[in-house]
Amino acid sequence: MEREKIFQELKNILKDTVTVEEEEITMESDLVNDLNLDSLDLVDLALSVEQVFGFEFSDEQLQQIKTVKDVVDIIESNLYTK
């Protein structure tokens, strides 16, 4: 899957998870500071990503997530290691 398609799907997941406009979501967006996700939102996001993309985040990966780009990078690496 192309990186841009991963990003677009992640934006759709984020729009469903929290009240945020698509234009506000960039690769550099900080999930907590820019998009105002709280800890429950982050759990919902992780579960949705796992379901849509068919993999489970490792504990280490979850700790590394700060920005939208971080999530895209992890999705991409998991898709290509299958």
Curated annotation (Swiss-Prot):
PROSITE patterns: CARRIER
Keyword Oxidoreductase part of the UniProt annotation: no
Modifications made to the protein after synthesis: 4'-phosphopantetheine is transferred from CoA to a specific serine of apo-ACP by AcpS. This modification is essential for activity because fatty acids are bound in thioester linkage to the sulfhydryl of the prosthetic group.
GO cellular component: cytosol; membrane
Modified residues (O-(pantetheine 4'-phosphoryl)serine): S39
Gene Ontology MF terms in the entry: acyl binding; acyl carrier activity
Domain of life assignment: Bacteria
Domain (Carrier): residue spans on this chain: 4-79
Pfam families listed in its UniProt record: PP-binding
Keywords: Cytoplasm, Fatty acid biosynthesis, Fatty acid metabolism, Lipid biosynthesis, Lipid metabolism, Phosphopantetheine, Phosphoprotein
Coiled-coil annotated residue ranges, if any: none
Localization: Cytoplasm
GO annotation, biological process: lipid A biosynthetic process
Entry-linked InterPro entries: ACP, ACP-like_sf, PP-bd_ACP
Pathway assigned in UniProt: Lipid metabolism; fatty acid biosynthesis
Sequence similarity: Belongs to the acyl carrier protein (ACP) family.
Function: Carrier of the growing fatty acid chain in fatty acid biosynthesis.
PANTHER family attached to this UniProt entry: ACYL CARRIER PROTEIN (PTHR20863), CARRIER DOMAIN-CONTAINING PROTEIN (PTHR20863:SF76)
Protein name: Acyl carrier protein
Gene: acpP
